[in-house]
Amino acid sequence: MIKTARQLKDLIRNLSKDKSADAQILMRNYMMERFLERISLSEYRDKFILKGGMLVAAMVGLDARSTMDIDATVKGATVGIEEVENMIASIISVPVDDGVEFRLKRISEIMDEAEYPGIRVSMETEFDGVITPLKIDISTDDAITPHEVRYSFKLMLEDRSIEIWAYNLETVLAEKLETVVSRATTNTRMRDFYDLHILSQLHGQSIIPADLRAALIATARKRGTEKYLADAPAAFDEVEADPNMEKLWRAYQKKFSYAADLSWHTVMESIRNLYRLARAE
């Protein structure tokens, strides 16, 4: 068990060198893992379903994807500010012998470019005097197709895993694929494009085409964007040919070394192939 900030910082520093990852991001990931462990031990363990960047990073490795926050959906519960406040308070009060203290700072409704509404939770952790900010975005009633899966989340600094509920691979891909199709050149989140590429490269053999197809249709139906699916090939061509999109991709490559050697065309071809797989009869 890690007992001091010095010990933790040394471990993070060594991992940072090994993974060519930012030490500050790894520190935040460690604290996010501490929160996940509390979830896995709490009364909400069967309601809390991990999705988003933290799940993608776990699936592909921290050397191939970084993330700064937790995205989750809650099953079978109302997601209002009061309900989330009670839920988070209960989760962070779960006793875990790791020396980490969680403090709830702010809870607000998500009003930015969210696909559908949710609640944003801002917290901070303290470990041996070191303060780390955390953010959690929580939604409800997501279209998980065919269903969520039990996921063994491998810890960063320990040789063990946490058992949690998570999106299945096909739903992860479907949500991002729907976003790329429906938003086309208005989607400036290059991580969506990267995630589709890296997941297809590393987990392509695990994709069940029928589930991907069903998940894509269910996601589009949930978001009211079914009409865009048939025109996806044209949308992909428009996105790839758009100078601003390629400029955004180059900026993403400069910011994240794991994307440095990926051409824009290669990424878009991966996305086209995923769409073909999803639409195959």
Question: Which residues does each PLM region occupy?
Answer:
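Structured mid-to-C-terminal alpha-helical surface segments
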Residues: 1-48, 57-66, 70-281
